[in-house]
Amino acid sequence: MSFLRSFARNKDISKVGRRGIHCMQKLCAEKISPDSLEKAQNRVIDAALTLVRENTGLRKNLCHSLGGAVATSTLLGVPLGHNSSFLEGPAFAPPFIREGIWCGSANSTTEEGKDLKDLRIMVDVGDIPIQEMRDCGIGDERLMKVVSDSVKLVMEEDPLRPLILGGDPSISYPVVRAISEKLGGPVDVLHFDAHPDLYDEFEGNYYSHASSFARIMEGGYARRLLQVGIRSINKEGREQAKKFGVEQFEMRHFSKDRPFLENLNLGEGAKGVYISIDVDCLDPGYAVGVSHYESGGLSFRDVMNMLQNLKGDIVGGDVVEYNPQREPPDRMTAMVAAKFVRELAAKMSK
């Protein structure tokens, strides 16, 4: 019975995720002129960016009023799930992650002793209204630009640094692109994932969640890409890694690679370090609320050891692929994703 309920929920999600497609078809059927439609879409995009700009400016002013912050982690939700090839539930993740961050079952202090209630450590500027833009028929190329522009708006407000709540992994591409363009050069990327996400295209989708790191590498936005937790990879994934010079650390060799990975020093000669955490890097026993189950993954403490021991200036990060429709009502995986956000926020801030 629980399977049937889950199946029904996922069918509902699929309908919601395709709302933008249906809306575009309806707009075309009504014979609205392309010029009028584009003008209306541009106004919606301007409104979305204005929302991010005003929220970001307010949080910057609050940080400045307290004084002393060099880098403040800034949560920005990107509720996008339609580029997933399987389930689109990650579009609904940001509110559940936020609830996990602030729920009463844990205090606001991170493992290294930083209090997240201190606005110099972490602020939240809300979500980009992705679905509202899709409902206006705005396609992926323009959506990705809105994500990039939103990240740049965050970075314009010193000392704010972007920490993104996904969303499916396709969002990593426009975020890393924005950071690299804003800083004037490539960053080093530490990517935790069960999958390399290096397909040139997947099922004909240039912006697929399975292609995000191919887009990053071909754009020259990453100097080094280290992928940790890999255990679902085919011939194309390995060929693409070789083509782009990606350093892949597969789970079958993790015990041998652990000493190196727990003592990383990244970012020297680059514009900083970007951390991308796909929740399915973890073994499903630690995180059932993901779209793709791959047994034999990392433990939560494995990831924390690598993150907490990392040396380098972290200029941005994301936590993606949490799917609230794939777990029981206790939302345990939301707490896992929230813990990733909390500890990454602490690591980024200074």
Swiss-Prot record:
Biological process according to GO: putrescine biosynthetic process from arginine, via agmatine; urea cycle
UniProt gene name: AG1
Residues holding Mn(2+) 2: 193, 195, 278, 280
Principal EC category: hydrolase
Entries under PROSITE patterns matching the protein: ARGINASE_2 (PS51409)
Signal peptide: none
Annotated residues for binding of Mn(2+) 1: 193, 197, 278
EC number: 3.5.3.1
CC cofactor: Mn(2+)
Alphabetized Pfam families for the sequence: Arginase (PF00491)
KW Ubl conjugation (keyword) present: no
Keywords, in A-Z order: Arginine metabolism, Hydrolase, Manganese, Metal-binding
One GO MF term: arginase activity
Annotated pathway: Nitrogen metabolism; urea cycle; L-ornithine and urea from L-arginine: step 1/1
Record's catalysed reaction(s): L-arginine + H2O = urea + L-ornithine
SUPFAM superfamilies the UniProt entry points to: Arginase/deacetylase
Listed name of the protein: Arginase
Binding sites annotated in the UniProt record for substrate: 195-199, 203-205, 234, 321
